[in-house]
Amino acid sequence: MSKVYDWFEERLEIQTIADDITSKYVPPHVNIFYCLGGITLTCFLVQVATGFAMTFYYRPTVTEAFASVQYIMTEANFGWLIRSVHRWSASMMVLMMILHVFRVYLTGGFKKPRELTWVTGVVLGVLTASFGVTGYSLPWDQIGYWAVKIVTGVPEAIPVIGSPLVELLRGSASVGQSTLTRFYSLHTFVLPLLTAVFMLMHFPMIRKQGISGPL
């Protein structure tokens, strides 16, 4: 086993990377509230894993979506547990994200030179809220349907571009199959991809600039 490790160590310098990660200075004022961002990341990873598992059974059509969710909850092996964990971690992710934003703001973590870290964090917050809106509709039950109808109807109040924007969100003049397809694509592909991209921007900046000092 040591020979295998030595082979990788010689080529990748694993120990050097590990030492760099574990030797990062942590200021003495850091407490449990500074872990909220990491908890949000953990919830996101749980979301990815459980969401991926449900794609094997979920059917994004207006005629089969609700029945497929029922199948996940009642017949698929551990489906009830996977979906329940997905829902619980979704709520936890939103809560932790909100608390994380408050913690950063109250401790001045948005100030120079961390402005870009703050901006990417705000974008991640918007993406998190978007996950909630798009995911809420996927069971296509009465709650999901009317939630989509209300949310997608909000931009209609905007002068000139309101109606075209509503049609863009819905995929047609009314809520239907095109709307569900759009929301499913956003929830399972577009939003996770954008979230991963902004996380890959967010974390290196935190790593480079370190944790902000006490007020």
From Swiss-Prot:
Chloroplast in keyword set: yes
UniProt keyword list: Chloroplast, Electron transport, Heme, Iron, Membrane, Metal-binding, Photosynthesis, Plastid, Thylakoid, Transmembrane, Transmembrane helix, Transport
Subunit description: The 4 large subunits of the cytochrome b6-f complex are cytochrome b6, subunit IV (17 kDa polypeptide, PetD), cytochrome f and the Rieske protein, while the 4 small subunits are PetG, PetL, PetM and PetN. The complex functions as a dimer.
Note: Heme 1 (or BH or b566) is high-potential and absorbs at about 566 nm, and heme 2 (or BL or b562) is low-potential and absorbs at about 562 nm.
Disulfide feature: none
InterPro entries in alphabetical order: Cyt_b/b6_N, Cyt_B6_PetB, Cytb/b6-like_sf, Cytochrome_b_N_euk/bac, Di-haem_cyt_TM
Role played: Component of the cytochrome b6-f complex, which mediates electron transfer between photosystem II (PSII) and photosystem I (PSI), cyclic electron flow around PSI, and state transitions.
Residues binding heme c: 35
Cofactors, names only: heme b; heme c
Any one annotated GO CC term: chloroplast thylakoid membrane
Binding site for heme b 2: 86, 187
Biological process according to GO: photosynthesis; respiratory electron transport chain
GO molecular function terms noted in the UniProt entry: electron transporter, transferring electrons within cytochrome b6/f complex of photosystem II activity; metal ion binding; oxidoreductase activity
Protein name, entry field: Cytochrome b6
Organism: Populus alba
Annotated compartments: Plastid, Chloroplast thylakoid membrane
UniProt record similarity statement: Belongs to the cytochrome b family. PetB subfamily.
Textual note on the cofactor: Binds 2 heme b groups non-covalently with two histidine residues as axial ligands. Binds one heme group covalently by a single cysteine link with no axial amino acid ligand. This heme was named heme ci.
Transmembrane domains' residue ranges: 32-52, 90-110, 116-136, 186-206
Residues reported in the UniProt entry to bind heme b 1: 100, 202
Listed Pfam families: Cytochrome_B
Keyword Transport found: yes
